[in-house]
Amino acid sequence: MLIVRKPKKKKDEIEIVKVGGKIEDGIEVKNNQKIFANYKKVGDKYKLYRCRVGDKLIQPSKVLELLKSDKIFILKENEEEIEEVLKSYNLKFDYIELCPFCLLKNIYKRLTRNNRCRYGNLEICINCGINEIKEEVKISEEFIEKFLKRFKDVDKVLSLLRIRNPLDKPELTRYDIITGSEEDKIENYKIDELDIPEELKEIIKSRGIEELLPVQTLSVKAGLLNGDDLLIISATSSGKTLIGELAGIKNLIKTGKKFLFLVPLVALANQKYLEFKERYEKLGFKVSLRVGLGRIGKKVDVETSLDADIIVGTYEGIDYLIRTKRLKDIGTVVIDEIHSLNLEERGARLDGLIGRLRFLFKEAQKIYLSATIGNPKELAKQLNAKLVLYNGRPVPLERHIIFCKNDFAKLNIIKEIVKREWQNISKFGYRGQCLIFTYSRKRAEYLAKALKSKGIKAEFYHGGMEYIKRRKVEDDFANQKIQCVVTTAALSAGVDFPASTVILESLAMGADWLNPAEFQQMCGRAGRKGMHEIGKVYLLVEIGKKYHAKMENTEDEVAFKLLNAVPEDVKVEYNEDEEEEQILATISAGITNRYDIDRVPYIGRAFSLNKILSNLESYGMIKANNDVKLTNYGSAVAISFLYPKVAEKIKEGIIENKEIIKLITEIMPFENVYLSNNLKIKLSKILNINVPSRFFDALEVIREGMEKIKDKKLKEDLTLIIMEFEGVEVEEKILEMIINLRISGKTPGQISKTLYEEFKIQTYSGDIYYYLEQLLNLLDATERIARIFNKRYAEKVKELKEKIENPK
């Protein structure tokens, strides 16, 4: 290939370059590889003369030979004279577009449809566009490239990064729109056409539902109403719950056998319990809830009877009934959020639960509900279920990305989005409401408070709240009394607020970035069929932001990875601790024959049964013959949901008469303890280092830096803190403080306040609430084991447990 062009500022000269290789990637050409030739008009034609390579002159005839030897390309614009020169020698040519910025660096790069962008009046390559933006904005190259490939315009990208109020330019912030698929065009079944009892039809129609949604229709076609086991995969909020209800209530009416509905989180179980109670008690069915109800705070009156027709529960709540052999007469099992199989630790427990349900209730219909995953066929085969795969969305989803300079800017954008959404009333008569996800409970509380101070009706919602408070927030949102709810990323699977808009204030969950499954779940919460015409998602991204030092990527880099991520495969593989727990749980459920234990259809088993049984026998939890017998110790461990090796640690502490606080700290330390932010900032300046946020780490830094602290009051305060923890295990001491404050009658909020006021220790009421709930479960387990090995120890544990649960 030959490229012929006019060099800049040379009126009567052409440049000829021979290019080999992939010119779309850019080829560097040195000056000594270029041929220059002058031209002049003689009569009505042009002639070449004074030709050279560098400083060396060559004959015009040699240049003509070269021009005739290969295909010639010239630039499209302002090259009329070159065209005339080539025509004078009867030379044929085509046109080519080169990046003008690359040419300035002696790089010849062809512009194609995919590698170009606009900059002012010029067309340049994506790489040069990236460099121009990097000159003005500090941002990752990958991030810029994604935007340039989308907008094809440097100025537009710069506008997006600099815009004062991005909400005024939705065409700039909009990343994409996810709409329906071919499946959305199918003819949906009318409710009256379904093979279900008339009373169920009336209940459904009373909710304003006259016909099924696409995924529901596909499920009916796949055998939902014929008792077939199904794995149903579709986006969040696409109508999966009703699928379970159709099968469960139909089977209940026809056979009288129980309908089980399993969910991963207490918050979601509470919501489903109240919904089913309202809907189906009018048919004469009893609905009960099986979850670990909160024991800290006000007690809640809910139905928990096992004689109920419909039982809603968390995975652990239902598994407890199986491990204690108290679950009978099951007709339908619906397991929601089955993609939770991917979760560390919890995935193994869910897999074990599913295996036991499949083995014990072979005749029951199993419906597995999942968000989008990467290996649906494989999972359906493993579950021995028919696959129903729906890729559409009942409501289109707009995804926007907005750049924010700092947390303050994020807060202002959130306020503006919430206000605009609230003013927007859908054709169905609903105001727009927002669901805001952030990385921690503390942050959720802070944002809700900050938004309230700006006149927004906002509430926080997280797992550390008492049931009654959570329920009030749910009701207020459903009744459109509040404009937005701020919740944690960790609760994304358990939040079912009918929001028009989802705002991701952060792309982190705790100390880690969101994974694609979590991100997709959050996005799926935006837009509800019959309430909103469209759902919106806003990613608020701070360029270069990391929430923890261990994070490898920055928030801007993570944003594009999440937006472009493909669904993750669901994979389950037990480690030894997990397999020991699941085999012990199976034996506890009454499956005691070796052959039967081996036939329980787990997905994740990785060890031989003989090895696991041998381990359990060595702990004294079973007696392994052909028919395996569970010991009292094994039973206590199984119903306590403990790893057997952890139970061994507890047993050892009980036998040694170890102090209860010491034993608890070894098994389950309270780790969410921080130095107050004001003190951290002050000390970091004085000591000229970044003082750690975690209290345990910061205390050591304070001890070593005391000599540098000259402020008398500060030194006195720090000395008191150091003396309080001198010569003791800090974790034990803090746990002892928390327990003593609780026993004295303080609420989690009051405990947090006392620790701050007296020791500048920052804790959060939600974390303390959650920890005390988990602590009571651990004390239950410890008491069970102690009843076998040390009854006096058991009494001490029982006494402590009662004091924590029912303080003065």
From Swiss-Prot:
A motif (DEIH box) lies at residues 336-339. Keywords: ATP-binding, Helicase, Hydrolase, Nucleotide-binding. Gene3D superfamilies: 1.10.3380.30, P-loop containing nucleotide triphosphate hydrolases. The keyword ATP-binding applies. Pfam families: DEAD (PF00270), DUF5814 (PF19131), Helicase_C (PF00271). ATP binds at residues 234-241. Residues 221-391 form the Helicase ATP-binding domain. InterPro entries: DEAD/DEAH_box_helicase_dom, DUF5814, Hel308_SKI2-like, Helicase_ATP-bd, Helicase_C-like, P-loop_NTPase. Residues 396-585 form the Helicase C-terminal domain. GO terms for molecular function: ATP binding; catalytic activity, acting on DNA; helicase activity; hydrolase activity; nucleic acid binding. A motif (Q motif) lies at residues 189-217. Its EC number is 3.6.4.-. Belongs to the DEAD box helicase family. PANTHER family: ATP-DEPENDENT HELICASE MJ1401-RELATED, DNA POLYMERASE THETA, PUTATIVE (AFU_ORTHOLOGUE AFUA_1G05260)-RELATED. This is Probable ATP-dependent helicase MJ1401. It comes from Methanocaldococcus jannaschii (strain ATCC 43067 / DSM 2661 / JAL-1 / JCM 10045 / NBRC 100440) (Methanococcus jannaschii).
